């Protein structure tokens, strides 16, 4: 059995913490031979964990790609706006790519990357890890088996969780769409992908409403300050207090471990005192929506209502799939799927085992599938290939376009046509390839 050799571009939370445990557990399947990471602490931590030598370490992806081809594939886990250039350069150099979602925050770049992967005959797989979880696999199986007849409508709720929202989308890296992507893409492209996968048809119309309503300077309480540590008069009662949130035990609050490296108590306090995670949630440079709804119609007549909210107790996804012969209700947090059959009145509740791997088994699942696809030379139309993912990305871009235009209905056929590659993919080159 051939051992697949990988290089990792971006050794942060996803590149290191999410995907490397699989590599460490299955060294005969996959081996990491290099890492490119600008942060020295992260680079050295990665090297120690994966037993890499100094010759296998690179500060930038450009430095790595200037070398002769070293391995089979790259795992690219940079920030959203830094996906396009390394991906195109890697594909052009003959590498297969596993790319963290979203593909890009620019729809033209998404279209071009998919076209280049096809032209080069390379596998470009997108990290839509939810498709690989036992929960969503079971949901898809029940629908495909006809358990509820023909699907008519779907209600899909993404409950972001009030603390997760404040951490990632008010104070964190995804707070501003000029730094990352719109919320519907940065957070909800998983959901757009799942919806497209479950419906199994192209989307024809999209309409969306939403806004940044609460986390704004005009809603800052009287007596609040720029930072939670500046003598804020309401810090002790504020649900978003950085001191209360980030100084908790990191074993019970995983977000607290993300603001400092290593996440010692002293380092976390320094991060609160001087970094973005200590800012008042009403006084940051955030601009992404805190709630949004999307209505969709598909070619097969299915209608979908999607809701994303940052104002929920739990981080959860709740889905209701309504068919001609029954109904399915799924609760991701409890990992239960409730099937009701109209003809018999029978209700069947299935408890889905929860994997210890990240994203309820999805992180391991996508690594396993990517390695298998490479070993068996499956490069086109895989479960989360760029070909499969592009449609859901365009749905997200269309939803944002609608939201910014007062909920105007977007015709998806015309929308897709507007993002055809501006030039032939074969003419798209980067300096790194010259």
Predicted regions, residues:
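Beta-strand-loop-alpha-helix segment that lines the small-molecule cofactor/substrate pocket
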Residues: 67-68, 73, 79-80, 84-131, ...
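Predominantly a Rossmann-like dinucleotide-binding segment in NAD(P)-dependent oxidoreductases
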Residues: 12-15, 130-279, 406
């Amino acid at each position: 059995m051939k051992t697949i050799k990988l290089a990792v571009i971006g050794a942060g939370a996803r590149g290191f913490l999410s995907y490397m445990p699989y590599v460490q557990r299955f060294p005969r399947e996959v081996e990491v031979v290099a890492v490119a990471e600008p942060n020295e602490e992260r680079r050295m931590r990665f090297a120690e964990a994966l037993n890499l030598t100094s010759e296998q370490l690179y500060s930038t992806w450009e430095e790595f790609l200037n070398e002769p081809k070293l391995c089979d594939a790259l795992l690219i886990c940079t920030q959203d706006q830094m996906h396009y250039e390394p991906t195109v350069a890697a594909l052009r150099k003959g590498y297969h790519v596993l790319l963290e979602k979203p593909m890009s925050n620019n729809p033209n770049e998404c279209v071009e990357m998919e076209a280049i992967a096809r032209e080069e005959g390379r596998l470009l797989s997108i990290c839509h890890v939810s498709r690989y979880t036992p929960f969503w696999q079971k949901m898809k199986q029940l629908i495909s088996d006809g358990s509820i007849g023909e699907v008519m409508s779907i209600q899909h709720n993404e409950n972001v969780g009030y603390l997760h929202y404040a951490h990632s989308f008010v104070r964190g890296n995804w707070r501003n769409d000029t730094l990352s992507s719109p919320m519907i893409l940065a957070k909800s492209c998983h959901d757009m992908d799942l919806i497209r996968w479950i419906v199994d048809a192209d989307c024809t119309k999209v309409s969306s409403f939403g806004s940044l309503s609460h986390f704004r300077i005009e809603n800052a309480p009287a007596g609040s300050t720029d930072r939670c540590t500046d003598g804020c008069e309401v810090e002790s009662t504020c649900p978003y207090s950085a001191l209360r949130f980030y100084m908790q035990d990191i074993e019970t609050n995983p977000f607290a471990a993300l603001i400092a490296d290593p996440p010692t108590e002293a380092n976390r306090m320094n991060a609160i005192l001087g970094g973005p995670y200590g800012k008042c949630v009403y006084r940051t440079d955030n601009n992404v929506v805190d709630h949004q709804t999307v209505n969709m119609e598909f070619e097969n007549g299915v209608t979908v209502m999607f809701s994303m909210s940052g104002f929920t107790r739990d981080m959860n996804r709740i889905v209701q799939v309504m068919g001609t012969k029954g109904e399915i209700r799924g609760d991701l947090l409890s990992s239960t799927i409730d099937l009701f059959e109209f003809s018999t009145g029978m209700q069947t509740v299935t408890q889905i085992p929860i994997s210890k791997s990240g994203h309820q088994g999805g992180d391991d699942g996508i690594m396993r599938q990517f390695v298998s696809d490479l070993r068996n030379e499956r490069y086109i139309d895989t479960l989360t290939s760029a070909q499969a993912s592009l449609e859901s990305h365009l749905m997200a871009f269309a939803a944002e376009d609608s939201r910014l235009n007062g909920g105007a209905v977007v015709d998806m056929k015309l929308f897709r046509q507007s993002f055809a590659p501006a030039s032939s993919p074969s003419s798209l080159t980067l300096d790194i390839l010259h």
